[in-house]
Swiss-Prot record:
The record marks T429 as: Important for serine binding. This is Serine--tRNA ligase, cytoplasmic. The gene is SARS1. The modification Phosphoserine is found at S241. L-serine binds at T271, R302, E325, N427. It catalyses: tRNA(Ser) + L-serine + ATP = L-seryl-tRNA(Ser) + AMP + diphosphate + H(+); tRNA(Sec) + L-serine + ATP = L-seryl-tRNA(Sec) + AMP + diphosphate + H(+). Keywords: Acetylation, Aminoacyl-tRNA synthetase, ATP-binding, Cytoplasm, Disease variant, DNA-binding, Epilepsy, Intellectual disability, Ligase, Nucleotide-binding, Nucleus, Phosphoprotein, Protein biosynthesis, Transcription, Transcription regulation. The modification N-acetylmethionine is found at M1. Changing K482A: Abolishes nuclear localization.
Amino acid sequence: MVLDLDLFRVDKGGDPALIRETQEKRFKDPGLVDQLVKADSEWRRCRFRADNLNKLKNLCSKTIGEKMKKKEPVGDDESVPENVLSFDDLTADALANLKVSQIKKVRLLIDEAILKCDAERIKLEAERFENLREIGNLLHPSVPISNDEDVDNKVERIWGDCTVRKKYSHVDLVVMVDGFEGEKGAVVAGSRGYFLKGVLVFLEQALIQYALRTLGSRGYIPIYTPFFMRKEVMQEVAQLSQFDEELYKVIGKGSEKSDDNSYDEKYLIATSEQPIAALHRDEWLRPEDLPIKYAGLSTCFRQEVGSHGRDTRGIFRVHQFEKIEQFVYSSPHDNKSWEMFEEMITTAEEFYQSLGIPYHIVNIVSGSLNHAASKKLDLEAWFPGSGAFRELVSCSNCTDYQARRLRIRYGQTKKMMDKVEFVHMLNATMCATTRTICAILENYQTEKGITVPEKLKEFMPPGLQELIPFVKPAPIEQEPSKKQKKQHEGSKKKAAARDVTLENRLQNMEVTDA
């Protein structure tokens, strides 16, 4: 995921100042641009010198051949005149005055200079890339410039009644319909582990079927993706911070052969966007085949580092969930990708409108965008039981930022193009099932249970097509369990012990002062 290097090169029509300004608007380090420009300039000088040295090496070989053809004496003198050693003034005439043995020595010295130059070039290339991959995509002009998404995300439009309040939050409702095992899930899988069961399994499957049918009717190709990716491929679709904060690493045998003890490093996907982005890696996509639209279905795995204490109960923010994703490869020409961007968010809006979920669309501030996104719109549903808007959909246009590193090119072949172009790539959530279930539970709650949304009825089993009944009391209204009481008593004892310790310390201080 990188920008075009020519954007940093003034002699190629680039504008480093524009990229520096973009970094500032993203509230990221603009100094990365200057470091990249410096490394790139040195890299280009190094490559130019290496090219010249190779030409001189070829000239030496040619001159040796001519001298051998003329049967000139080889000689045994390996001394090299001072004017030749600089290589900068080395010409065919200068070589013609040397013995074959001397020219061979010059050629060896040139080889050493080439190796040194190549080592420097590789070092500069790595330095340049380290800066390049941490510089974000160019921003769309409509992106709000701010580093505070809680205050400055721009509400673009609202659909439905986003003021109504209801009694229970999704945290209680998943228990009331007996569709969730949280404590046992945590014992088995750790923090945020859960079992989805009973009626909520049917509701989840209904959402998956309805979302896939909706996208299929709009020309999307359903695709079920791998759940893990090779490290070298994941590096091309994920930014560096995701490896620390989001992705799970999987270590396994590198071969199916029993005597092979090598190990392979892979990563669980955080979204089907990642494997679908790599689906056409190293390919040329023909203009007449675009857009290519995929409806990705996968389980997603996220560490949620940095989310400690947020949404710890229920199924809204979990480490594992199912998701249907819109993913599109688009032409880079004629504003086609931005037209597709609007089409994709509209598709998501119509899906949630059909489910009767109130929402607003927000334009995400520049400081909260990931490196790849040129612009991102979120659909945040109204949760009447929680009294808050919660994110259900993110829709991003990454332009050619992802495609460049994945080498997904636009057109036929390089021979038919004046300059290599890259396709534009877009992604948008259609339905993250656990979050959408939470939204349905809060919006469709009644005194007796959850009314099934009209569009999902045909996908639900007999007996559950109209109402999902409450079968358990709301946890918020229950007496504390024995375990909870024990934990509460333990907390009280610890607090009392701290108070006694503090009092003793104060008394000791008084004695000392006296």
